[in-house]
């Protein structure tokens, strides 16, 4: 039974997405359906965490705009995600960057990996 589940999950995993890690700044192009219209909305921010693996993998992106912080969690293998662009690579030493929630301004900045 377990082999059947793993085989089904392996079919659903996307391979067209770039490699990105926690601390990277990414642009997520997400399809939004409003009535009969469909458009693409771009959400840019820092990746706070990546959870699980395989077909159920998710990642959370945080951005601060006009002094309001917004965190969105996206499923990696969702068909609603059109593409993910890595804007810059971040240098971090943690798997979950929850400490960024308490920081404001330049203190919330992640160093760039060269």
Curated annotation (Swiss-Prot):
SUPFAM superfamilies: Translation proteins SH3-like domain
Gene3D superfamilies (UniProt xref): 2.30.30.790
Highest taxon listed in the record's lineage: Bacteria
Keyword annotations from UniProtKB, A to Z: Ribonucleoprotein, Ribosomal protein
Keyword Protein biosynthesis in annotation: no
Pfam families: Ribosomal_L19
Keyword Iron-sulfur: no
One cellular component (GO) term of this entry: cytosolic large ribosomal subunit
A GO molecular-function annotation: structural constituent of ribosome
Annotated GO biological process: translation
Function: This protein is located at the 30S-50S ribosomal subunit interface and may play a role in the structure and function of the aminoacyl-tRNA binding site.
PANTHER family in the cross-refs: LARGE RIBOSOMAL SUBUNIT PROTEIN BL19M, RIBOSOMAL PROTEIN L19
Recorded family membership: Belongs to the bacterial ribosomal protein bL19 family.
Protein's name according to its UniProt entry: Large ribosomal subunit protein bL19
Species the sequence originates in: Clostridium botulinum (strain Hall / ATCC 3502 / NCTC 13319 / Type A)
Gene: rplS
């Amino acid at each position: 039974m377990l082999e059947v589940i793993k085989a089904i999950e392996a079919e659903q995993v996307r391979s067209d997405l770039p490699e990105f890690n926690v601390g990277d700044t990414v642009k997520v192009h997400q399809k939004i359906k409003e009535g009969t219209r469909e458009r693409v909305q771009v959400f840019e921010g820092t990746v706070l965490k990546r959870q699980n693996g395989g077909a159920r993998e998710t990642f959370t992106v945080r951005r601060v705009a006009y002094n309001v912080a917004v965190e969105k969690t996206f499923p990696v293998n969702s068909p609603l995600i059109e593409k993910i662009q890595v804007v810059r690579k971040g240098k971090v030493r943690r798997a979950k960057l929850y400490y960024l929630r308490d920081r404001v301004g330049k203190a919330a900045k992640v160093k760039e990996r060269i």
